[in-house]
Amino acid sequence: MSQLQLLRAQDYPRMPWKNGGGFTEEITRDSGEGLDGFGWRLSIADIEESGGFSTFAGYQRIITVLQGDGMRLLVDGQPSRPLLPFDAFAFSGESQVSCKLLGGAIRDFNLIYAPQRYRARLQWFDGTSRLYSSASTVLLFAASSHVEVSMAGREVQRLGLYDCLRLEGNDELLGLEVQGRFCLIELISR
């Protein structure tokens, strides 16, 4: 049976960005210290003004706007589509990236992972969803103030805004019924 850990948003450690231009709240990671050595990491960042992103050589990134009007990224000189809330966008951590805010400040959600160590899948859902996963690590990130997660043989887990449920060591098909707006992240070791 998988190990379950409920992570509360008010407990996330706050740390400076790698480039020093802002702050990140780290939700969880697989291992490593500081800004190096992890195989994957989930975080939330507040972007108050347009500017450059940190580089993460050897990593893949998936970013999603959570709050605010959105942003447009410039990735290695190529403009992205406008990134609006709950519209995920992937890019290489090695890329030179800057953002242009479409309005005021935004809050975003980030998955950074090492593709040579993990395969990753990230999807957003809203409403009632019945899901099945055989990934060794499953993360459910709550993007609304009331998210309920039901699993066979376990009590219902209630998540508040930006809380995260981490299910680790899954060795069989995991069935979940989830109510609310949330992100499902599946990570499989290579």
From Swiss-Prot:
Recorded superkingdom: Bacteria
Q: Which InterPro entries match?
A: RmlC-like_jellyroll, RmlC_Cupin_sf, Uncharacterised_HutD/Ves
CDD domains reported for this sequence: cupin_HutD_C, cupin_HutD_N
What is stated as this protein's family in its record? Answer: To E.coli YdjR.
PANTHER family assigned to the protein according to its UniProt record, in alphabetical order? PROTEIN VES
> Which protein is depicted?
Uncharacterized 21.2 kDa protein in hutC 3'region
- Species in which this protein is naturally found: Pseudomonas putida
